[in-house]
Amino acid sequence: MKKAAKIVLLVVLLAIVGGIVYTVLTWPIYPQPRKSVDSYQQLRQDMEKTGVLVPPENVLPWVETFYSQELDGRDRLSKPMAFLMSGTVEYGGASYWTELYGSREWNYDRSMEVPLRENYRMTPIYRDASDNSMLYFLCIDGHIYTVQVYADGKMPQDAVDYFDGLLLEACHTVVDLYQ
């Protein structure tokens, strides 16, 4: 009888320890499925595992840059599935918020609504614009990339022309990564 009691006690203790370990590993530690990354090198290294290629740090003439990753969950076991490089770019004495986003999943269904800007190396690049923002996006090897700029008010025409060329060149840089 003592041997059976010891086995039952051991099974109960293992179940408790297993429950604690599972809770620690799966307890949400990120308030959102996104986390900040300290450096470009860390971002690039983390994203290599996903197959999503990160363009060079100077793909846009950033004044200041922030890096973050979108995660597939909120717990300790979450893995990166997308990245965001964001910051300000200055033109004509004004600062414009810019973002470059790359994801391993095509979850962006705007290609039917947005006009095609051009095909670059057999990759369609789409462009959408409003008075205070401009968006370019493309899909290559199943990965989606978006590059966008925002203004505080209506963008002057010279800024529109500048960012039109700048964002398109950033898209070309992304496509060239896969060549």
Predicted features along the sequence, with ranges:
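Residue-level detector of intrinsically disordered, flexible termini
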Residues: 3-4, 14, 81, 93, ...
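A short, solvent-exposed beta-edge/loop patch
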Residues: 108-179
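Membrane-interface motif at the C-terminal end of an N-terminal transmembrane signal
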Residues: 18-33
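N-terminal Sec-pathway targeting helices
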Residues: 1-20
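Short, solvent-exposed recognition patches
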Residues: 33-135
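Long, compositionally biased, charged low-complexity segments
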Residues: 23-24, 40-43, 47, 160-163
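Short, flexible coil/linker elements and helix-boundary hinge sites characteristic
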Residues: 27-28, 48-53, 153, 179
